[in-house]
Amino acid sequence: MGALGLEGRGGRLQGRGSLLLAVAGATSLVTLLLAVPITVLAVLALVPQDQGGLVTDTADPGAQAQQGLGFQKLPEEEPEADLSPGLPAAHLIGAPLKGQGLGWEATKEQAFLTSGTQFSDADGLALPQDGLYYLYCLVGYRGRAPPGGAEPRGRSVTLRSSLYRAGGAYGPGTPELLLEGAETVTPVLDPAGRQGYGPLWYTSVGFGGLVQLRRGERVYVNISHPDMVDFARGKTFFGAVMVG
């Protein structure tokens, strides 16, 4: 009986101790669960916020300097200017002169003079320096067969355009032929058999080539039928450009 009494009393003590341990563990767990969110809220309340929660202030001067350098815009490099002078060039367009002559316009529409080139109807195109030049010329022509009673009636016409040079190192002697082109046209008679003019015809004589020229030499155009030149836009022009 004494032994049984001791065993019962000891079992009750062990059960009571287990219950106390369980209560203590549960209390600690609840305390821990409540402490974590409270701590997080306290930290968030103390952190300075700006611009949607991003931290912009820092106590480290070095970090501020690095942040400023990160947003620094580098200056754009300006392209180097091309200091080399342009090559001499000229483009002249045909213009009528008094007395049914062929003149040239140097400043209107597409015409131009660059890098020291000069022009006058009396002296022609003057080039400013020695070099290899590409010369070109195109002359448009138009006309019609004369009336039936006139002579020559229906005869072929040879149209010729030429480029010459004179002056400068070449000297004041006879101008030298540089380039030339020609075209033969046979005007059509009046198809109705009347004694009037034939239908209007159009053609052009064009050519170009490389020529070695010296400073001061003058280039000009000579044509065979100035009274037949077509002065419509883009039909008659000549020019030069230095290529070497």
Curated annotation (Swiss-Prot):
Record-annotated THD domain positions: 88-243
Keyword Transport: no
Alphabetically ordered keywords of this record: Cytokine, Glycoprotein, Membrane, Signal-anchor, Transmembrane, Transmembrane helix
InterPro entries, per database record: TNF (IPR006053), TNF_C (IPR002961), TNF_CS (IPR021184), TNF_dom (IPR006052), Tumour_necrosis_fac-like_dom (IPR008983)
Residues linked to a glycan: 222
Gene Ontology biological process terms from the UniProt entry: cell surface receptor signaling pathway; immune response; positive regulation of canonical NF-kappaB signal transduction; positive regulation of extrinsic apoptotic signaling pathway
Membrane-topology descriptor: Single-pass type II membrane protein
Main location as per UniProt: membrane
Family assignment from sequence similarity: Belongs to the tumor necrosis factor family.
Summary of the function given for this chain in its UniProt record: Cytokine that binds to LTBR/TNFRSF3. May play a specific role in immune response regulation. Provides the membrane anchor for the attachment of the heterotrimeric complex to the cell surface.
Subunit-structure text: Heterotrimer of either two LTB and one LTA subunits or (less prevalent) two LTA and one LTB subunits.
Name of the protein described by the UniProt record: Lymphotoxin-beta
Protein's organism: Macaca mulatta
